[in-house]
Structure formats: C-alpha cells, structure tokens
Regions:
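Linear, non-domain "peripheral" regions
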Residues: 1-152, 218-219
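Short capping/connector residues at structural and topological boundaries
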Residues: 46, 50, 142, 186, ...
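Hydrophobic/aromatic-rich core segments of domains that either
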Residues: 173, 205-274
Length: 274
C-alpha cells in the first residue's frame, strides 16, 4: 500500500513530547516511523540478498497501516537502476521484503517511511483457529526449551484455577521481577533458561522466559517484535493466545514482561513469531 502524497500526510501529523502525554486518556493516535538502515562493506559484495521485515501488518487489533514507502540507495547507481524489492509472506503471515543486487561497491541504504494509526476502541487482535492451535506457539522452540528452574516457576505460577488472561498477567509480573535489564550480557542465541539463570538481559530475554513459562502452563503464546515509543530501537514483547470470553473465536492478548505492563497505544506491532 503506497501513499501517493506521503509528504503531505507527514506534514499533517505534527510532533509532541510523549513524556507529557496522559496516555490513559488518549483514544487515537498516528505515528510516523522513519527507519534508516545502512550496511557498509569492506569491499565489493557480489550477489547480495537481503531480507527486511520492517512493515507492520495491515491490521492488528486497534492498529492500522496507513501508508508506507521504502527508498533504496546504492552509491554510484542511478535510482532507476536500483532493483525493486520482492514482497512475500512468511509462515506467520509477516510481510517480507526481499532485495537482491548483483554487486554492491561499498554500501547500501534502506530508508523506510511508515504511518500507522492506533485506537483504543478496537478489540485485541483477532486470530484464526489455525493460529491458536499452531504447535509453533504451544511447543518449545530452540530458545524457549525449559529447564528445571523454568518448570518449577511454571508449576508455582499455575497454582489455582486462573483464567488464561489472569494467569498470563501473573506470569508477566513474575518475569518482570526476576530480571534486571542490562545490555551486553546476553545475545541473540541466549536461551530462556540461560537468561533466567543470569537474572539479567534485554527485552528478547524477558520475552523468551515468558514464552517458555506460558507454554509450560498450557498457554499458547508468540513473540512480538515492534516499536515502543521512547525506546529508540526495536522492542520485543509477548502475545498470549486465548479464546474470546464469549467463546466466539480467539484473540492475541499483549503483555510486556520487560516493563511489567500491558502494551497500549505507545506500542506498534511489526511482526510475530515463535
């Protein structure tokens, strides 16, 4: 979905200091996401293949994609000669932009402009029965394999007959209390068990621990990647998949164990996965 006059739309949005916003009273907001990704290489690169997952879904609960634009610049190449990315969907329905180039001399720039709207009137993101029963969201992944400590935590947290949302909230609060946020301690291959043992980590570690415990407690759950206003870079949180209270279908309920809260209007979902 490309907007013919993105510049005009951007000009109407305006800016504000999010620290001064009384978020509980906000019912609707629009966001401009500007991302500039630059890749530098020590020398010429041949047969480059790049995959980008930066475009939010068309709809996700109260979030709606309004418009998007991607510019690609390769020094030394006229814009009309830069290849156009191919669009596809991965197994979870996320939009993937695939870019290929025969040769890159030194660098390549990807610049994205994305506008999304969010409101509080909409229900949580509705999911299909196929998604709810997908084993990918109920069984451990490589990064969420449980150990004895995670199993013990799940057993303690699952005491009682809590509804899925209440149990998820209990797990969310517990994970938040167990870790201290700290950069440089963990990496992209750090497992939930390792992060819990360290009791330190970043948002992806909080999310992996919550995913592991939710699945041990019988709650299907998935990883969410997106943006949190004021964080600067990307952020990760969790969606717990549950039947709707009226029994009509299924929804994805968001939780952010890093901050110990429920994501609101200041969160933007980009992609979901295991």
């Amino acid at each position: 979905m490309e907007h013919e006059n993105l510049e005009t739309l951007i000009a109407t949005l305006g800016t504000l200091d999010h620290h001064g916003v009384d978020w509980p009273r906000v019912q609707w907001t629009a966001y401009l996401i500007h991302q500039h990704l630059r890749y530098d290489y020590p020398g010429p690169i041949h047969d480059l293949h790049q995959r980008l997952m930066i475009v939010p879904p068309e709809r996700h609960g109260g979030q709606r994609l309004v418009t998007r634009k991607l510019e690609i610049a390769i020094p030394g190449q006229p814009p009309e000669q830069v290849p156009t990315p191919q669009e596809s969907r991965d197994e979870f329905g996320n939009l993937v932009l695939s870019f290929s180039a025969t040769e890159i001399a030194r660098s390549i720039d990807f610049v994205a402009w994305i506008v999304v709207e969010r409101d509080t009137a909409s229900d949580p993101a509705i999911i299909s029965a196929h998604t709810f029963f997908n084993p990918a969201f109920s069984e451990p992944s490589a990064l969420t394999q449980p150990d004895d400590a995670l199993r013990a935590a799940a057993a303690a947290l699952a005491v009682g007959d809590a509804a899925p949302e209440a149990l998820a909230a209990r797990i969310n609060a517990w994970v938040h209390a167990q870790l201290t946020y700290e950069h440089g301690i963990t990496g992209v291959r750090t497992t939930a068990a390792e992060a819990l043992a360290l009791q330190r980590g970043v948002c992806q570690d909080y999310a992996h621990i919550m995913l592991a415990i939710c699945r041990l407690c019988g709650l299907p759950a998935r990883y969410v990647s997106g943006h949190l206003l004021g964080e600067g870079g990307s952020h990760a949180w969790v969606e717990v998949l549950a039947p709707r209270p009226n029994g009509d279908g299924y929804v994805a309920l968001p939780f952010d164990p890093t901050h110990g809260n429920r994501p609101g209007l200041n969160y933007i979902t980009v992609a979901t996965g295991r």
